[in-house]
Amino acid sequence: MGITSSIFREYDIRGTYPDELNEEVIEQIAFAIATKCHKEAIGTLAVGRDGRLSGESLLNAFCKGLVKAGIKVNNIGLVTSPLLYFAAKKEHSKSGVMITGSHNPKNYNGIKMVINDKPVAGTEILSLIDNESKKLNIFKDAEITFTDIKENYINEVFNNINICLLYTSDAADDT
């Protein structure tokens, strides 16, 4: 199956499942992202997904593509995008990928990426698919680990909240 170039957007990758974005396509995209990771000396990516029905299958195919290309995967599972970005920033070379359809209709899914703390454009990944990923040396398969990062995220959020209660006279009036 060929890859439809229209799924590669300025800030992400989005397409209908399974017509435009499916397991075969997403594995090829993962291989291209691995090319970028190798160029930037990134050895591990945090990878998560949202709750869409196609999410788990696409996440597994994506991880398979990364591992085949020698990138270690920390699968953080079903999470929100902010939690994925937290995991990427705090624990994974400031790099991660979120499988998410975002605000699109339920038959869509997609990919948001950050490598070295910078968002990666879908159009850049298309260029890598066209030019670079075919040249990627095949590495020894990497590994996949599974981490529940939610507790670390919650602790970080609560440890950085400064709640200030303001008491003033006549703040509430019973009239």
Feature locations, PLM:
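An N-terminal, well-structured beta->alpha segment
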Residues: 1-64, 68-69, 146-166
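N-terminal small/polar loop signature for handling phosphorylated ligands or for N-terminal nucleophile
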Residues: 44-108
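Single conserved hydrophobic/aromatic residue that forms the stacking wall/gate
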Residues: 167-175
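Residues on a specific face of well-ordered alpha-helices
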Residues: 64, 82, 86, 123-130, ...
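Flexible glycine-/small-residue-enriched beta->alpha junction loops
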Residues: 93-145
